[in-house]
Each structure stands twice: as structure tokens, then as C-alpha cells.
Amino acid sequence: MGKTTTTLNLGIGLAHQGRKVLLVDADPQGDLTTALGWTDADDLPVTLATQMKKILQDEPFVYNEGILHHEEGVDIIPTNIELSGMEISLVNAMSREQTLKLYLADLKKDYDYILIDCMPSLGMLTINALTAADSVIVPVEAHYLPG
């Protein structure tokens, strides 16, 4: 439906205008990660799931660890299928909707824009993204209305 494409193109467009942009792939399918060329995301040592898991388990973490830089000028927090297990972990967590916001809090000072690509359903990961967001873009498909 264009969510990943919108996130990618908007991020690269902003980067080309001299803005510092961080893309967050919050969809376990990892299409944003793949679109930027990381096709072996399962082999990455640190992903969004890794960092969120550390927050949930109250473990120390380096906030900018695992951020990858792309030649188009954007940075990305990649994801892989491991993120799908995060939905289950978040269900029983305290302040579960704040996990992503807590992670991104320290990163905000390093970027002009943080764009979060979400999955097409309203699960705990999407709720986390909405809680962390200052603004929301909802791509819709235009249809002709008869009459």
C-alpha cells in the first residue's frame, strides 16, 4: 500500500536536502531494510528487536549501536523476523507502548527526522510507533467514487 516506499523516498528526499534522517524499520517483514540493500538482515548482530529486548529486560544498551548508514545519506535501524516475537514480549510488559519511544529518546538529538515504517496492522509494534511519533503520515490508495 506504499508505506515502505513513502518512508524510503521521503527519508532519502530529506537527506538530499541536507537533513539528518534516521529510518526505523518497525515491520518484521523488513522490507525497508531490504530496500536499502541489507538482504541478509538475519545475520546482523544488532537490530530493532535486539535493542527493544534490552529495554524490556532493563539491560544497558548503547543507543546508537547497530545503526547502519546508507550511501543515499540516511541511517537505518534495521529489522529482521526476530521483531515478530517482540509483539508477544510486549503484551505482558509494563509501559509496553513506551518501549520504542524510550529507545528513540536519545537518538532524537542526533537527527532532524526519524521516520518509522510500520506493519499494516495495529499491533503492539504499531502502537509503539504511534506513541513514539510526533506526527503520522497515513498513505491511502485513491479510488474513483462513482456518481
What annotation goes with each model-predicted range?
Residues 1-147:
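P-loop NTP-binding core
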